[in-house]
Amino acid sequence: MSEEEDLTCFLCAFPFEASQRVRCVGVCGHNNVCSICFLRLRSIQRNFSCASCKQQLDHVICSDKVGAQFSDFTIWGDNIGPDYIYDEKSQMFFQKAYHISKVETLWAFKCGICKQTRRDMKQLKQHYQAEHNMQMCELCIENKQAFPSEQKVYKQSDYENHLRKGDQDGSEGHPKCEFCRKRYYDKTGLFMHLARDHFTCHLCDRAGIQFKYYADYK
């Protein structure tokens, strides 16, 4: 690994920085994945393995201490010392100041316009609609591997464009079933719906025409 690579996260390529992304280490010894990526892997994707060696990690410790090793800490249940907080969902230990300033912010259901907070995503979505006439995408909320604070909000015209074509960041729109007129998060979701709820023609199959679906056999 080059010196430049060692200064950036193995997954997102953002630099390690005490206030934003700190190094994490597991019992395997690898420390090249940042706190945000590890938190996303473990709490949202439910992937508890090391991104480098794939070893399953019961716990991960995030620290801005230079050269910190897993063996430097003694774990007593959910405690490794007064300076750290245990995040139960991800089974990660964070320094208290970092957990308050960054981790809690990522999980907060906070309006990006008026800064009011709500109890859950449903209430936040209702708040945007009622107070700001803006939309959150339910398909993205249910399927996108993102923290609540990373979910986008849209003006009505932009929301329709988001559904049909996607966003300027290169993300695709949500494809619509031509029979049900219902949208799905991505092409995989649409394909699974078509295969489960609609019909193929055995004559088309024999002719080598694949992935052609019909509303019914009439």
For the regions a protein language model found, what residue spans apply to each?
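Proximal pre-RING flanking segment of RING-type E3 ubiquitin ligases
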Residues: 1-26
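Cys/His-coordinated zinc-finger cores
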Residues: 32-47, 128
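Ubiquitin/ubiquitin-like proteostasis machinery centered on ERAD and p97/Cdc48
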Residues: 59-102
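Short, non-ligating residues that shape and space the ligands of small metal-coordination modules
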Residues: 18-22, 35, 43, 59-60, ...
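General zinc-binding finger modules coordinated by cysteine/histidine
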Residues: 85-218
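Short cysteine-rich clusters marking metal-coordination/redox-active sites
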Residues: 9-12, 25-26, 34, 50-53, ...
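Cytosolic, low-complexity regulatory segments enriched in Ser/Pro/Gly with interspersed Lys/Arg
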Residues: 55-57
